[in-house]
């Protein structure tokens, strides 16, 4: 087997439990003003210098900079609670990191946005994705093509949503399917589960695997769910089948949230997050004729419960050299981003 490279970074944050929400047709738009930016880099940079929201984020960072418990090497939110990293990708010379950002003026998950040349030094950008018609913008992944970047994520209460952007700094996003894959409503009996998606492309067909859990294990215990869908146009999606075959590594009670699927070395990797034991991965073989993944090896990034302080919620992208770069979430109770490390210090004695 050829050498496999997995680069991992930690993402300092805190956790809020996933709630169950009633089905609603639509939710109000964000209280944060959504702006449109120019389509060329020179004008975008000039507009960002004067942007009031970017200035606000800079002021938040300035407030925290002298806090001894503020993470320096690891990315953390400019304000408020920080949830999962999402949609890590490389586009036109920059690394882009999206994350579940809960602004103080509208305490719902938006996709925050930061850009970097080296995956270490990050610069805040305006919010990328705003909730509505979905209640909140949960986890998902991106796919960078030659002419655009595709984001696919779980929109709370409606299903998986597809959005695209093609400008130099990925500032302007258009939702092309809301939802692309509708959520399974209460009382519906369907062979699949709709939650966090990962997206890729084979030939001219897009594929998405939605990870999560179903109560189909022994004694109605939760079991991981990996449902495969396909589309030719990003708008109309067809359910194919259960993506993972002959998987014997995960016990009842595990789930497969925040999935990512990609070739690595001469095999394939399936990254995911269990709400029981944190970030994990499966290596195996992918049958392109069947469009099924056959895992043969299981590994963990986290060796304890993911609460508190565990490594979880991976966001990944190809490094362009046959490897995969992964950024994980790391949380500690419901603390502001600048006080996360203080929690570990106080509980390390």
Give the predicted meaning of each segment.
Residues 1-26:
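Bacterial Sec-dependent N-terminal signal peptides
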């Amino acid at each position: 087997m050829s050498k496999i490279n997995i680069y991992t970074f930690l993402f300092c944050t805190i956790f809020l439990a996933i709630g169950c929400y009633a089905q609603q047709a639509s939710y109000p738009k964000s209280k944060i003003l959504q702006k449109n930016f120019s389509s060329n880099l020179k004008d975008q940079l000039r507009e960002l210098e004067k942007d009031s929201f970017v200035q606000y984020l800079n002021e938040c960072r300035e407030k925290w900079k002298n806090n001894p418990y503020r993470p320096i090497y690891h990315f953390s939110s400019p304000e408020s609670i920080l949830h999962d990293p999402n949609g890590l990708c490389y586009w036109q010379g920059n690394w882009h990191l999206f994350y579940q950002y809960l602004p103080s003026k509208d305490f719902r998950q938006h996709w925050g946005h930061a850009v970097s040349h080296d995956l270490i030094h990050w610069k805040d950008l305006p919010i990328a994705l705003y909730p509505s018609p979905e209640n909140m913008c949960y986890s998902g992944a991106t796919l960078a093509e030659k002419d655009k970047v595709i984001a696919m994520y779980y929109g709370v209460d409606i299903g998986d949503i597809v959005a695209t952007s093609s400008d130099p700094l990925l500032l302007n996003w258009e939702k092309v399917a809301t939802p692309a894959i509708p959520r399974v409503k209460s009382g519906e009996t369907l062979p699949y589960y709709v939650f966090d998606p990962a997206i890729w492309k084979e030939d001219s067909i897009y594929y998405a695997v939605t990870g999560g859990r179903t109560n189909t294990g022994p004694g109605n215990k939760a079991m991981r769910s990996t449902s495969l869908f396909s589309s030719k146009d990003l708008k109309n999606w067809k359910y194919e089948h259960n993506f993972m075959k002959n998987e014997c590594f995960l016990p009842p009670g595990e789930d497969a949230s925040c999935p990512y699927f990609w070739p690595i070395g001469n095999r394939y990797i399936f990254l995911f997050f269990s709400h029981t034991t944190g970030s994990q991965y499966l290596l195996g073989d992918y049958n392109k004729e069947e469009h099924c993944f056959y895992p043969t090896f299981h590994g963990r990034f986290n060796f304890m419960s993911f609460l508190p302080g565990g490594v979880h919620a991976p966001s990944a992208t190809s490094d362009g050299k046959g490897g995969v770069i992964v950024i994980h979430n790391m949380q500690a109770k419901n603390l502001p981003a600048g006080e996360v490390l203080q929690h570990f210090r106080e509980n390390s004695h």
